[in-house]
């Protein structure tokens, strides 16, 4: 049986995973990078340093859980599967992967972080038999609707030698021209032709961007709002819980059972005070800087802090506007492509609030939304290993 070690080093997490040839997850380890209170992310140099610290520790932990033979090592080389896509954080994982592969005398292969996100959901979904499909990548720095096609590598399956001992491992350093990018690859209007810059790198998918953001991402809006409220970065998960709780109170017969001492009138007043303007979507494209400005102006104007009722109301409306905008974007791209199903990946797509509301919105338009496992939507090394 062949076992593959996967390594991913994003702007948010250090991740290591082991899978077998039947796609069973043997080991899945992740560690958030530490961000100082009040800051909205890390500089690349700081993130790179933390990855260098985390990787040996996670490798030791992996070996305590799995002592079998590793037959190949896979890693993320770059944010997106295209020439010019580059971020220093991925040098930590690719360098560590090459060293580990050389030490174990096994092959090493690299993909893009975005391909890892896609494969982590696709491999365990109905899309695993589709060679072309519509997908969304919603994460901390990416907001894209993609027309995805398999390359010959995916159609033919992984080369047999990935599961055989080799005479050595490739040790050439990855290189690519730097581009101005948000966390893990900002949106661009057109996909460039995939062009691996490293002999160990492979391209599993070609991705053409058919919709998305023209400025910032959903993840950035959520994180900036959360940090402005005094939350730790990344803040999307905490805001998601708050949004769900407010909706639960709205649906409860007595809101006071959810928020002690709160009446329905108080709930409605909080909702009205924090109401945000909907995001306009045209031809599958949108701008999110306005939503970001609105949310933070509400925080300043109302003097909001964590745990206040109005803060929960703001979280709920922010997620509601995000859900509607994302759904509208998908609907427009679906109409243009003629595809009635969409795969959703990325950390933002792990939100329970978004999953519930978007399924309802999209199903009403005859579109099937495939989200997959919540944990596999977030940054992970499983997709890279697959």
Tell me what each language-model feature is:
Residues 241-342, 351-367:
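A contiguous, well-structured pocket-lining segment that forms one wall/lid of small-molecule binding clefts
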Residues 150-162, 198-251, 298-300:
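Glycine-rich phosphate-binding loop plus the immediately following alpha-helix
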Residues 117-120, 372-386:
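Glycine-rich phosphate-binding/hydrolytic loop that grips phosphoryl groups
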Residues 75-78, 100, 139, 343-351:
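Glycine-rich beta-strand-to-loop/alpha-helix junction loops that act as flexible
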Residues 10-49, 154, 204-209:
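Short glycine-rich, Thr/Ser-proximal phosphate-binding strand/loop in the N-terminal lobe
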